[in-house]
Design a protein with these regions (language model features):
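Flexible glycan-contacting loops in extracellular carbohydrate-active proteins
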Residues: 210-237
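Extracellular beta-strand elements of beta-rich domains used
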Residues: 65, 239-243
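Short, aromatic/His-centered strand-loop micro-motif at the edge of beta-sheets
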Residues: 164-188
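Secretory/extracellular carbohydrate-interaction modules
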Residues: 96-163
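Ser/Thr-rich, Proline-interspersed low-complexity disordered segments
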Residues: 16-62
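Short carbohydrate-recognition loop motifs
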Residues: 82-101, 225
Length: 246
């Protein structure tokens, strides 16, 4: 209907034009100008909830092996037989079913110069075997290793890798101590690496100080050690390890 009225109005206006044309009123009321269109923008996608940052690994701590071994690295020398490594009953269990295996559990996130390491463990083997501690471990330069055996002996070694899975051990010192308990007993060992001296502890008693000034190891990682000899199986359970200032 609106189209028809507009057509009639145009015809009448053309036929009756005067010299000064009268402005034609608008057929539609004056409307408010349409708003300036806003450029289309992509709808924002829903943002995902940020995941919490992982807890940084501590530098000084006590590990009681209640959970995973995150931050720890397992290395093996000697026999390439696969060991059984697990956490069970708040213990790190290192089981070696093959002879002449040296196992290491290294704490990877940190390097230390002067540091003290203490561990509590149980040697369940009825045959010769050892448990120990490491300090100043470097894949390129080597490490210091302190071991105690169920027969009452101990030693300190300088170890270094010759190739993958093949290590060389140079004896620094050895001895015996009545403080070392037989197999089946829970006991503690401690090692302080301070400048050019190693301090050896058994059941919280200092048994020896060792001069290592001739070895150019200034800092590195720390860790635990376990080894089997000619008879197997060997099972060593670490209850805890404490890393502290010397």
């Amino acid at each position: 209907m609106k189209k028809l009225l507009i057509g009639c109005l145009i015809l009448l206006t053309s036929a009756c034009q005067s010299t000064t044309p009268t402005p034609t009123p608008s057929l539609f009321p004056t409307s408010t100008p349409p708003p300036t269109p806003i450029p289309a923008t992509a709808s924002p996608e829903p943002s995902s909830t940020p995941e919490p940052s992982p807890t940084p690994f501590p530098r000084l701590f006590t590990e009681e092996f209640d959970g995973s071994l995150a931050g720890w690295v397992i290395l093996q020398a000697g026999n390439d037989g696969v060991p059984n490594i697990k956490t069970e009953g708040s213990r790190l269990i290192l089981q070696m079913d093959f002879p002449y295996i040296w196992l290491y559990a290294l704490y990877g996130p940190e390097d230390y110069a002067n540091i003290r390491i203490d561990a509590q463990f149980e040697n369940r083997a009825l045959t010769p075997s050892s448990a120990g501690l490491l300090c100043r471990y470097s894949e390129e330069s080597g490490w210091f290793e302190y071991n105690v055996s169920a027969d009452g002996t101990y030693n300190v070694l300088y170890g270094r890798w010759l190739s993958v899975g093949v290590a060389e051990y140079l004896p620094i010192t050895d001895g015996t101590s009545r403080k070392i308990q037989p197999s089946g007993a829970t006991q503690k060992i401690g090692l302080t690496c301070s400048d050019s001296t190693l301090w050896l502890y058994v059941n919280e008693t200092l048994i020896r100080q060792v001069d290592v000034s001739s070895y150019e190891l200034t800092e590195g990682k720390v860790g635990l050690a376990a080894s089997s000899f000619e008879n197997t199986p060997i099972v060593i359970g670490f209850d805890s390890i404490t890393i502290s200032e010397p």
